[in-house]
């Protein structure tokens, strides 16, 4: 049930991390026989109760559980999708095993948010549309902001044909609207379809992400 428990927590309770930690610490000294939530399974044994307590304590700290990369992209004609797939390919070549790739136009944001919470790194890719960030990516970032998402590492790739706005918009969001977010690598702005001369830029970004993954330490919250 862990995946669905995380999806419920991050999308419904995620905004209220400090309150969750306070509540857990207040009851941590009590002898709890069972937890019967409105959603999900009933936790009946000391082992499962301790397990879900520690999960909620960790999730409410807004820190990742595992090293890995979530690639979230929006694409109008398939060009940004191709770039996202190339990023995944280059990361795989460098030995990164935990890679999740999502089309923000097709996947419910709750699933992407759950994995963004779980993994240390995220890559966001989107095109410019009407001199703004592509709406489905704008919505995804808005959802993350509303849930107080923080303490993660993100890389950014914009895509445009005539005028560029997506890359700058995503950089502004993650540097101004979120707490403790680290931009990994140089934000990229690819013009139209992915071309041969763009590959070194993608490869360099993959190098930077892999180096950041290797340097990242996972901290586990304690009661």
Task: Please tell me what each predicted stretch does.
Residues 72-93:
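Short, charged N-terminal beta->alpha structural module
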Residues 73-76, 104, 158-159:
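Cofactor-binding loop segments of dinucleotide-utilizing enzymes, especially the Rossmann-like FAD-
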Residues 1-42, 86-102, 112-223:
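FMN-binding flavodoxin-like domain, especially the glycine-rich phosphate-binding loop
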Residues 47-48, 82, 167:
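A short acidic (Asp/Glu
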